[in-house]
Amino acid sequence: VQALTDQSPHVRRIAAGVLTKFTHAENIAPLLSLYSKADEKDSHLRYTALLGVRNNLRDNKEIKKVLGIKWNEEQLAILAKVMLDVPSAETADFVLNYIKNHEMPRQQLIHSFEYAGRYLPSSRVDDAITLISQQFEKDKDVQFMLYNTIRQGIAQKGAKPSPRMQQWGIGLTKYFIENISEAGDVWKSRPLDSTGEPVD
């Protein structure tokens, strides 16, 4: 771990690479620090640092320790991004809590909801639905995409959709049926000519 602060970037890269293979909760903070302090031009070092964070987070024995640590805002922001590559109910719960209390760019927000919806424990799905409905109140297309992601996640776990989830799906379906566009190719009903082909 001490080698992460060595003056030589080469030594720091090697040290970070080693910590990707030997996982421990105490490795996370120095790896986050290494990433934050690395020159933006040193993409290899920054990537290796994030890879180390991800691999340490993927260790089920260490994840609860990591989630119990009080992180500062900069560390939380990095963790929330890296966790999107960690298939875990615990980290999905962490990401949902981060979304609830922090602003983030729209595309990152969508990716974060996609991730959380896929891995969240069933007990938190309704919380995710509430947040999604608030964040994307006027964007039903995004809501529908996230609805499908969550639905697939529930099915993969062998669970059943909650009443709130069912209500959300019914509401979205009703919205799209009531707002079918005349220009839409999927839903548009066009007259047929004598051959049975649609008339343009």
Protein language model annotation of sequence segments:
Residues 1-200:
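Long, ordered, helix-rich scaffold segments
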